[in-house]
UniProtKB/Swiss-Prot annotation:
Main location group: membrane
Catalytic activities: a quinone + NADH + 5 H(+)(in) = a quinol + NAD(+) + 4 H(+)(out)
Protein topology in the membrane: Multi-pass membrane protein
Enzyme Commission identifier(s): 7.1.1.-
Keyword S-adenosyl-L-methionine: no
Top-level division of the source organism's lineage: Bacteria
Function: NDH-1 shuttles electrons from NADH, via FMN and iron-sulfur (Fe-S) centers, to quinones in the respiratory chain. The immediate electron acceptor for the enzyme in this species is believed to be ubiquinone. Couples the redox reaction to proton translocation (for every two electrons transferred, four hydrogen ions are translocated across the cytoplasmic membrane), and thus conserves the redox energy in a proton gradient.
Pfam families from the UniProt entry: Proton_antipo_M (PF00361)
Protein name: NADH-quinone oxidoreductase subunit N
Annotated organism of origin: Neisseria gonorrhoeae (strain ATCC 700825 / FA 1090)
Localisation per UniProt entry: Cell inner membrane
């Protein structure tokens, strides 16, 4: 590799993030627990500076670094800006929640920033090894974050289960990558795509490797039948960690899947589309039916996430229009989930965790504004117009219809109607059930509550004017496809 091929400028945001993270680590080591607020502010500043660097090096078109192993294009830039915004917002939500529970420590912020670095590498990968390194950096940080609350047996169990299954998925991914390399002789996505057109490429070995890669992608997205870690992780981890696990990594996983399957394995689109159809149908069915039976709202949101991932998998089947719809859906889902978990964190006052649906009973009688924000989240997740969630589902279904997938579209609509039941049940509990206990003052600080309001109201604003975000997604994919 020539030094001229490095071209660090496109990768400057990751360099800045890593540099600031290295400075934050010893600062946290020397700071006492009661001064962790400076680590909090340092983490917020790190994310803000990284976003500013990304904007400073923003340019149209696609550029690469490290001899094509790192790619900066419209999709990676948009995804990273959303990841930075989500991480910043979740740090603000998490501060008061973590302070009460004794987990307001530097580990939360440093591990979260390492996860952010891993996600940034994933979305900019132009090579299988780059994608794998980013994925492992994200996964290792999440394993430790989930077990952050050392006094919780549920957290330890969830972390162990996620670690074991995650290690298995990583092994399958590596095995699939080795088969792709054996079939094409390349690990660079563009090289794999070019080599797969060659008659000398081993088609059967390529397709066998594809199976292992799709399994790994399905695990990271949480699609059925590789979803069993999600309910335990969502339930066992502190809500501040659940919010992080359930939002930003999903966007990174969607872009990761796009890089590998569309950019690298586009020639076998028919094969992985068939697998995605089966995974999507199973995810929609199992996710919605299992969510109906839940009494714990975090487990309910875990199963609802499974159904949302089913919609994203359907979007991948619909070609270029579907890819834009899938990216839009991922951004919409992340905004909805961040707002939903944010409300739960604010309502978890003192040692009382707001985890069960019954904990929301009569919320409108005590916390009118928070009940309204949660109503917006539930309505958006259910796909009720004119909220953002409606246009996300509508975009995917229209993309499917344009490709002739009528039965899949009908099935998705039916499953959306089934899913609306458990979302509306939460609204019914908040507005029509009587609270069985007196409500103490809600947790959270003014910054968290204000940002939460903006987060939830964006679901309305971008629902009324959805074309703004849709155009962002379409333009992001222009120089990628």
């Amino acid at each position: 590799m020539n030094w001229s091929d490095l071209n660090l400028m496109p990768a400057l945001p990751e360099v800045a993030l890593l540099s600031l993270l290295v400075l934050l680590l010893p600062a946290d080591l020397w700071a006492s627990d009661d001064k962790c607020r400076w680590t909090h502010y340092g983490a917020l500043a790190t994310v803000a500076v990284t976003a500013a660097v990304q904007l400073a090096v923003w340019e149209q078109g696609s550029t690469s670094s490290f001899n094509g192993m790192y790619i900066a294009d419209g999709m990676s830039r948009l995804a990273k800006m959303v990841l930075y915004a989500l991480t910043f917002v979740l740090f603000v939500y998490a501060k008061p929640y973590n302070q009460v529970r004794g987990i307001f420590k530097g580990e939360f912020y440093t591990l979260s920033l390492f996860a952010l670095l891993g996600m940034s590498v994933m979305v900019s990968a132009g090579h299988f090894l780059t994608a794998y390194i980013g994925l492992e950096l994200l996964s290792l940080a999440l394993y430790a974050l989930i077990a952050l609350r050392r006094d919780s047996g549920f957290a330890a169990e969830a972390a162990l289960k996620y670690f074991v299954l995650g290690a298995l998925a990583s092994g399958l991914l590596l095995y699939g990558i080795s088969m792709v390399y054996g079939a094409t002789g390349s690990l660079e996505f563009a090289g794999v795509l070019a080599s797969s057109f060659n008659e000398e490429a081993n088609e059967w070995l390529l397709k066998l490797g594809l199976v292992f890669i799709v399994v790994a992608v399905a695990f990271k997205l949480g699609a059925v039948p590789f979803h069993m870690w999600m309910p335990d992780v969502y339930h066992g981890a502190p809500t501040s960690v659940t919010a992080l696990v359930g939002t930003a990594p999903k966007i990174a996983a969607v872009v990761f899947a796009f890089r590998i399957l569309v950019t690298g394995l586009g020639t076998v689109h028919h094969d992985w589309s068939l697998m995605f159809a089966l995974l999507a149908a199973a995810s929609l069915l199992v996710g919605n039916l299992a969510a109906i039976m839940q009494t714990n709202i975090k487990r309910m949101l875990a199963y609802s996430t499974v159904s949302h991932m089913g919609f994203i998998l359907l979007a991948f089947m619909a070609g270029a229009v579907g890819f834009a719809a899938g990216l839009y859906y991922a951004i919409t889902y992340a905004l909805m989930a961040a707002a939903g978990f944010g409300v739960l964190m604010v309502l978890s006052d003192g040692d009382n965790e707001c985890e069960n649906i019954s904990d929301l009973a009569g919320l409108n009688q005590h916390r009118v504004w928070l009940a309204f924000l949660m109503l917006l989240v539930m309505f958006s997740m259910a796909g009720i117009p004119p909220l953002m969630g409606f246009y996300a589902k509508f975009g995917v279904i229209m993309a499917l219809l344009k490709q002739g997938y009528v039965w899949l579209s009908v099935f998705a609509v039916v499953m959306s109607l089934v899913g609306a039941f458990y979302y509306l049940r939460v609204v019914k509990v908040m507005y029509f059930d009587e609270s069985g206990r007196a409500r103490p003052a809600a947790g959270g600080n003014n910054a968290a509550k204000s940002l939460l309001s903006v987060n939830a109201l964006l679901l309305v604003l971008w629902g009324i004017m959805p074309q703004t975000v849709i155009d962002w997604c379409a333009k992001a994919l222009e120089n990628t496809l």
